[in-house]
Regions:
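Non-heme Fe(II) oxygenase catalytic core, chiefly the N-lobe of the double-stranded beta-helix
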Residues: 2-16, 25-269, 285-291, 298, ...
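Ligand-binding pocket scaffold of soluble enzyme catalytic domains
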Residues: 5, 105, 121, 307-310, ...
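Double-stranded beta-helix
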Residues: 214, 302-340
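Catalytic-pocket segment enriched in acidic/His residues
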Residues: 263, 287, 291-292, 323, ...
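Catalytic cores of PAPS-dependent sulfotransferases
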Residues: 268-271, 276-277
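Short, charged beta-turn/beta-strand-edge "cap" motif at the junction between a beta-strand
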Residues: 278-282
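Intrinsic low-complexity, glycine/proline- and repeat-rich
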Residues: 329-365
Length: 365
């Protein structure tokens, strides 16, 4: 059983922002999870089921992550990412484009921790401010204006902090555990913008240096794209980051906008993809699969960021409660400034990467 990455594998992880561990989860754990999924009642949420959480807690993923990252709370729940086979659709996606028009099997490459409300399915009318107000008033809490109390349909707050200086939730690492054959593109696999974690870190640092407002609605990152076909698309990645990954392989939507080509992560049941929080990613349309795409997604945070707060394994905004509740922190503990520090220093929470990070940075200099 593999219990850690080799030095060369860590270099690859540093360069790419992700690494696929083949056979990280034993066949019996894979089978137990699949069996539990088959027996699920319609609408049953399987996230807290032991058959799901064991994919990390009882597999080699735990020792690998403990060595690579450091101590973390064992997940008590997870995201069950199941995508049925579908054809390209007419509906507007969260970026404000029709699903059928998005390249790369409908990829909507994004950073986690960002509020998402159901995309308007009609072209929006009015001024930009009117569109903004109407969109955020359509969320589950109604019209609260621009406020950290505003919640998305994904139960992520508009802002993490009361002062509205942090527009993204954050954590340390993703683990995507594969339970279906995703060895061929077009089967709904997770895709990642390879190497973009470095650009994202630099962008956060730039925002910090300008006015210490990080994420959407900070410098250089508007919340909404009013030029999208429905006039109300979410800006999931700032243009400054996106444009660094436009090249001759980039495909365009009908309006001529080019989109960075993400890497489709090809995996087989039992494989696990480890990725940094900073790595932009997306699910894709399961257009060519022979079965539903099944990825079980975990979000882990190094314990040193908040030793007294338990992270449940699924939340992308653990400085707030799962449903956006305000958490209690001891005096002198500013959780949002701690998270900003981690966002601007992406390797701070990767204990097992320090030697490689020092080596790679010395080469760059």
């Amino acid at each position: 059983m593999k219990t850690q990455l080799t030095h060369d594998e860590k270099i690859q992880f540093y360069d790419d922002g992700y690494f696929v561990v083949k056979g990280a989860v034993a066949p019996d754990l894979v089978e137990a999870a699949l069996t539990r999924m088959k027996s699920a009642r319609k609408g049953e949420f399987l996230g807290p089921d032991q058959a799901m959480t064991d994919l990390v807690n009882a597999s080699s993923v735990t020792p690998i992550m403990q060595e690579l990252m450091g101590p973390f709370d064992p997940p008590v729940t997870c995201q069950t990412g199941i995508l049925k086979k579908t054809e390209p659709g007419e509906h507007f996606n969260n970026l404000g484009y029709r699903d059928k028009d998005m390249p790369y099997y409908g990829a909507q490459v994004h950073m986690d921790g960002s509020i998402t409300i159901a995309a308007p399915q009609e072209v929006q009318q009015g001024t930009e401010q009117e569109i903004y107000d109407r969109y955020f008033a359509s969320g589950p809490k109604g019209g609260l204006g621009r406020s950290p109390e505003v919640m998305g349909n994904n139960m992520v707050p508009m802002f993490e902090d009361p002062e509205m200086t942090l527009g993204l939730g954050s954590f340390t690492a993703f683990v995507f555990v594969c339970l279906s054959d995703q060895s061929i593109e077009g089967r709904g696999q997770t895709c990642l913008l390879k190497g973009a974690h470095h650009a994202v870190e630099r962008f956060f640092q730039k925002q910090r240096d300008i006015n210490n407002c990080l994420g959407p609605e900070g410098p250089g990152w508007p919340r909404l794209d009013y030029a999208a076909p429905n006039r109300c698309g979410l800006v999931y990645l700032p243009e400054e980051v996106r444009n660094q990954f436009i090249d001759e392989t980039s495909e365009a939507t009908p309006d001529g906008r080019k989109w960075p080509r993400p890497t489709q992560v090809l995996m087989e049941p039992g494989d696990a993809c480890i990725a940094t929080y900073h790595t932009p990613h997306s699910g894709t349309r399961n257009e060519l699969g022979t079965e539903s795409r099944k990825n079980i997604i975990f979000r882990l945070r190094h314990k040193k960021r908040q030793p007294n707060i338990q992270v449940n394994g699924v939340s992308d905004h653990p400085d707030r409660g799962q449903m956006g509740e305000w958490l209690a922190f001891e005096e002198g503990n500013d959780p949002w400034e701690r998270s900003k520090f981690a966002m601007c220093n992406q390797w701070h929470e990767w204990d097992g990467m320090q030697e490689v990070v020092a080596q790679m940075r010395s080469r760059a200099n």
